[in-house]
Structure formats: structure tokens, C-alpha cells
Amino acid sequence: MSPVLEDVVELDKTAEQVVASMLAAEIAEKIFYTDERVGKVYPNLISPNAFDKKLVAIAVLGYPERVGVWSYTLLRQSRLSESSMEPYFREFARHEFGLVAIDPNFFDPDIEGDSFIYQLERVVADIAHDKKIGFIGFSLGGRILVEFLERSPLILGRAAGLVLIDPVLRNELKLGNIRRLLDNDTLLIASQDEGHSPGEIASVLLQIPRVSFPGLHGEMPNKAIEEIINFYEKRIP
């Protein structure tokens, strides 16, 4: 096994240990779907009774991370608490919000985004039409959400808001359908590190303001959680 692949395998194991801890603490549960493209079962992670809440937020992480952690870069630095998704599950439950974290890299790391879109569509289909949907995308997950929502205008009417955490976007973007969502109901988080961060570049590409935090790319989900909770609290009566 190559050193790079061995590294990712070990990081995957750490992510699985984080999930196991969350399951044992009963702050998260697994929900299983079948990927009809390959005939295999995969899990998503949900907060208890997530689909019964007035707001159901879908968290989309980056590449090649597995559900349970936001950043393998931080894991390599033994910064597990800053990378863990556990605070999100605790805070969303405390505020009576549902949270679903998809796991698009479950079978293999997916840099193209096909499994991201597939899993997003499955979760959205499971959310009742009287519920509002929140979208949270970090890194590649932010790009996936921008492109997914742009080509899914029927879903836009159900969106309570879009949170983009240091999203890594393409330079060429179509934004016609989501322009109103971007202007009125989008929270953009940007890292402040050396050079131009993904969030700073996204602010220019999307033509929307940003909320900046000092620190590295992988630190942003942990640093932004209070801002994100406040953002959704303002959008759900």
C-alpha cells in the first residue's frame, strides 16, 4: 500500500471512531440507503428525529473526508476536536434543528461529485414538503451545493438558507436560478490565511459579502458554528 493511500485509510478509521463515539452518546444515528448505481448500501449520519424538525439541514463535507470529521488536514495534526462534526450534532439538536451529514466518499473518494449529488437527491426526497431545508457546504461541498441548487429550481423554494464554508468554486459559474438565494439567504464563511482564501475568492465570484475568521481552511467549520446557528435561527419562526 502506498504511503498516501495508507494515510487516508488511517484517517478514515479515525473518522469512523468519531462516528462510533457519537452513536454511543446517542447524539447521532445512522440512516442507510442503497446506491442503486452499484447495488451497495451506504450510511448517512443524522441527528435523532432529524426529519421531524421544522428545519432539516444537510451538511456536505469536502474531499476526501469521510462523514464524522471536516478536515483530514487537522487530523494529521492531531487536532481531532477541531475537526469533529460532533459539535454540530449537539448544537443543532439543542436548537431543535435536524441535521443530516451525507457520506459521499464512503465507497471511494469522489472528486468529481457524482456521489455528492446522488446522496443529496436521496436525502432531499426524504424530507417532507412542509419542512424547510438548510444547506451547509464546506470546501468542495460548497461547490457541489452551488451547482446542485442552480440546476434544481424546484428545491430552491424549500431552502431556508445556504451556508458556504470556505467553498472551493469553479471560475465559470451559472448563478441565474440561485441569485436571489445568494443575495438574501446565504452565509459565506471565509478563512483569513496567507494569500487569497477560497472563501475570499468565492465572495468575488458570487458577488456576496463574507464573514471572515482567522485561521486555516480546515478550521473554519469549527470556528463558524455559532454564526451558522444564528443564521438559521433568524430564518425559522
Regions from the PLM with identified roles:
Residues 135-146:
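Gly/Ala-rich beta-loop-alpha elbow adjacent to hydrolase catalytic centers
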Residues 153-237:
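The feature captures the conserved acid-bearing segment of alpha/beta-hydrolase catalytic domains
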Residues 2-52:
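N-terminal cap/lid segment of alpha/beta-hydrolase-fold proteins
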Residues 147-151:
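Active-site signature of alpha/beta-hydrolase-fold catalytic machinery across serine-
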Residues 63-65, 106-107, 140, 168-170:
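Conserved beta-strand elements of beta-rich interaction domains across eukaryotes
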Residues 34-104:
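Short, surface-exposed "cap/lid" segments of acyl-processing enzymes
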Residues 83-88, 94, 102-133:
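Alpha/beta-hydrolase active-site loop
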Residues 54-57, 132-134, 161:
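Structural motif
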